[in-house]
A protein has these predicted regions:
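N-terminal soluble domains immediately following signal/targeting peptides that reside
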Residues: 17-148
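Bacterial Sec-dependent signal peptides at the C-terminal "C-region" and cleavage site
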Residues: 2-19
Length: 148
């Protein structure tokens, strides 16, 4: 069910028409060979620009780091490395990387991107790690959630 939800919401981010929902899709892929995880955040560019003035890398990175985080099993927040951002049609794709030598199991996720701006904000986080896929769904006011 969560996979279909993510697919459906992802389709919304692919269209060029005005969007009826405020949605952020985040994909986290653990790369065991490097002991790190690649993070791709897809967000409607106009929604993101309404929150981050100027659109500089430093402004975008500061906002993302304040609204999205990963913490290890002990609660230590993992440093998000900025790899850049680019537009793909109406969508802004933000690329990050995080050291995750122990994998993503039990990692705690905070996803509050744009929740401060839009009451109907829905954030989907899809993580691929250790031969499995897990999907977390966040709405405004949700607490941090752990990956299984």
């Amino acid at each position: 069910m969560h996979g279909l939800l993510a697919l459906g919401l992802g389709s919304l981010l692919a269209g060029a028409a005005p969007h009826p929902m405020h949605t952020v899709i985040t994909e986290i892929t653990h790369e065991a060979a490097t002991g790190s995880a690649a993070i791709r955040i897809r967000v409607f560019a106009d929604d993101f620009q309404a929150v981050v003035a100027g659109g500089s890398d430093s402004a975008m990175a500061a906002y993302v780091r304040g609204a999205f985080s990963l913490a290890d099993r002990s609660g230590r927040v993992l440093a998000l490395g900025w790899e850049g951002a680019a537009t793909d049609g109406d969508v802004l794709v933000i690329r990050l990387r995080v050291a995750a030598p122990a994998g993503l199991s039990a990692v705690r996720v905070k996803s509050e991107l744009l929740s401060d701006r839009f009451e109907d904000q829905v954030n989907v986080v899809r993580a691929v790690y250790g031969g499995r896929t897990a999907t977390l769904l966040f709405v405004r006011g949700d607490p941090v959630k752990a990956l299984p």
